[in-house]
């Protein structure tokens, strides 16, 4: 979806949008582009004919980690899910099909409607090891396009990109754990108070540094992790050139001392 969403915006040149790309996500995308593999990728690559018992246990237990509505799009996937409780009778082909269908299910429908993945969807079952290679190769290509596509649209001015403090911290609590009681008077505070304003400032700086390194520009907007803000940390954003931040309405309503925001058909 990371690529699909920004490509959708590019299809409508008059449309403007803001995307938040966290440093954690950017670093993961960079790692994948440089050849890193997660466990799911690793277990997908293994030839189904040489899967060990432990390999099969992992695949059975984790390769149905998909929304049931998505699984329902693939008849063979449904068939495998329904028989997974009796996997002792599964063939190597069953495992191979599951390896591939799990990855197809996690692919945006836009790309499933395009070749070469369209052919795999049409095939539906009895996949080969070569089919797995085609799928994983296509996934690599999609991953490689995420950062450059965002950077290009940001350069043209059609989108703005914001980011988040580096390791996705709850920034006010890094600044001072006692700040938890500002938003929640009854909050249970830690016995040992933690307060590292310098660390909090570094989180902001490093997040912006990474975004600038990988995207070619330094963001002027930021989305604090979980929308967590406090008066004490606002100056840290401003010091780094941040002009605006995003958070939730409940934070604003508490700041304005009003119960909630009322909505009508116009918003």
Residue ranges, per PLM feature:
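Carbohydrate-active enzymes and regulators
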Residues: 1-267
């Amino acid at each position: 979806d990371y690529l699909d969403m920004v490509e959708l915006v590019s299809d409508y040149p008059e449309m403007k949008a803001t995307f938040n790309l966290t440093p954690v996500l950017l670093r993961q995308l960079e790692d994948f582009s440089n050849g890193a593999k997660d466990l799911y990728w690793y277990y997908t690559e293994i030839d189904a004919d040489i899967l060990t018992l432990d390999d099969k246990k992992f695949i059975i237990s984790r390769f149905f980690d998909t929304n049931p509505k998505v699984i329902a799009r693939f008849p063979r996937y449904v068939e495998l899910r329904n028989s997974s409780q009796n996997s002792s009778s599964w063939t190597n082909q069953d495992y191979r099909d599951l390896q591939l269908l799990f990855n197809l299910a996690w692919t945006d429908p836009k790309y499933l409607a395009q070749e070469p993945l369209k052919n795999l969807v049409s095939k539906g079952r009895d996949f080969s090891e070569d089919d797995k290679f085609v799928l994983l190769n296509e996934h690599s290509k999609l991953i490689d396009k995420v950062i450059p596509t965002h950077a290009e649209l940001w350069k043209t001015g059609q989108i703005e990109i914001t980011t988040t403090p580096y390791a996705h911290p709850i920034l006010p609590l890094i600044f001072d754990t006692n700040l938890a009681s500002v938003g929640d008077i009854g909050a249970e505070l830690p016995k040992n108070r933690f307060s590292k304003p310098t660390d909090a400032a570094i989180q902001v700086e490093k997040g912006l540094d990474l975004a600038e390194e990988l995207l070619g520009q330094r963001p002027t907007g930021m989305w604090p992790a979980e929308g967590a803000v406090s008066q004490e940390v606002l100056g840290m954003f401003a010091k780094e050139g941040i002009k605006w931040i995003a958070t939730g309405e409940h934070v604003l309503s508490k700041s304005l001392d009003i119960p909630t925001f009322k909505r009508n058909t116009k918003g």
